[in-house]
């Protein structure tokens, strides 16, 4: 019997060509969840490669839209790397739109996506996908252990918040997030999960087992709900 569905947003810092061992571990965890019936969609960020391309585009004087397109293509390459690691249990192409994603999702295979369009973060994509497939949970596999009162990379006194509302989460993001460092959800993504009342679990993605643990129902990291 199918379980979920669950959307997992994985930082591009963990799924990229510089970390094949970690990509393999993510593939193993996703295989395990899929084998026991979970319907899964994974959205992968662009990571360091995207930032390199964006910086090069900036130095060339290219506009934000072109920078976004390069970042999207980097995220799609990361997604394709994970797809190949998941073969044959993953849909063979990273979808380019929500419609392509829904078609891929209908196959029952694990779907792995990157970015969709300029001006939209991969976190925004994950929120939109979670809404479109009626996800029971959105997991954010980030570079921190959960949601903190401040960016833990710059404020050593920052405290982990185990549970918070969407509005409290929005306030933390607005006041405490350092661009490019403390990866959570952007304001548009928060609005999407709030309007559809999708629970969001934030965990440290450096260990793929953390993702499996929260999908299986363990209390870990931070939980954002209505």
UniProtKB/Swiss-Prot annotation:
- Return one GO MF term: UMP kinase activity
Which reaction(s) are listed as its catalytic activity? UMP + ATP = UDP + ADP
- Which positions are annotated as binding ATP? 9-13, 47, 51, 142, 148, 151
What keywords were assigned to this record?
ATP-binding, Cytoplasm, Kinase, Nucleotide-binding, Pyrimidine biosynthesis, Transferase
Q: Spell out the InterPro entries in the cross-references.
A: AceGlu_kinase-like_sf, Asp/Glu/Uridylate_kinase, Uridylate_kinase, Uridylate_kinase_arch/spir
Source superkingdom: Archaea
Sequence positions that bind UMP: 46, 68, 116-122
What metabolic or biological pathway is this protein involved in?
Pyrimidine metabolism; CTP biosynthesis via de novo pathway; UDP from UMP (UMPK route): step 1/1
- In terms of one coarse class, where is the protein primarily found? cytoplasm
Instruction: Please list the GO biological process terms of this entry.
Output: 'de novo' CTP biosynthetic process; UDP biosynthetic process
Q: Name one GO cellular component term.
A: cytoplasm
Q: How is its activity regulated?
A: Inhibited by UTP.
Task: Tell me the compartments it is located in.
Answer: Cytoplasm
Q: Which Pfam families match?
A: AA_kinase
Record-listed E.C. numbers: 2.7.4.22
**Entry's family note:** Belongs to the UMP kinase family.
Instruction: Name the job this protein performs.
Output: Catalyzes the reversible phosphorylation of UMP to UDP.
| Self-association and partners | Homohexamer.
Put simply, this protein is called Uridylate kinase
The scientific name of the source species is Hyperthermus butylicus (strain DSM 5456 / JCM 9403 / PLM1-5)
């Amino acid at each position: 019997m199918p379980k979920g569905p669950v959307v997992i947003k994985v930082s591009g810092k963990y799924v990229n060509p510089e970390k094949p061992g970690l990509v393999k571990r993510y593939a193993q965890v996703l295989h395990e969840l899929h084998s026991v019936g979970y319907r899964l969609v994974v959205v992968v960020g662009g990571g360091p490669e995207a930032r390199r391309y964006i910086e090069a585009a900036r130095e060339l004087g290219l506009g934000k839209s072109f920078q976004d397109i390069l970042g999207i293509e980097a995220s799609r390459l990361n997604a394709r790397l994970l797809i190949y690691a998941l073969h044959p249990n993953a849909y063979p192409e990273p979808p380019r739109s929500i419609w392509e994603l829904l078609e891929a999702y209908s196959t029952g295979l694990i779907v792995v996506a990157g970015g969709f369009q300029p001006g939209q973060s991969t976190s925004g994509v994950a929120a939109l996908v979670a809404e479109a497939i009626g996800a029971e949970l959105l997991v954010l596999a980030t570079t921190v252990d959960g949601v903190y009162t401040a960016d833990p990379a710059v404020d050593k006194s920052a405290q982990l918040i185990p549970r918070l509302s969407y509005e409290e989460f929005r306030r933390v993001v607005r006041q405490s997030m350092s661009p490019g460092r403390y990866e959570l959800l952007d304001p548009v993504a928060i609005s999407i999960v709030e309007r559809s009342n999708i629970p969001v679990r934030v965990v440290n993605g450096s260990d793929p087992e953390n993702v499996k643990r929260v999908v299986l129902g363990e209390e870990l990291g931070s939980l954002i709900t209505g």
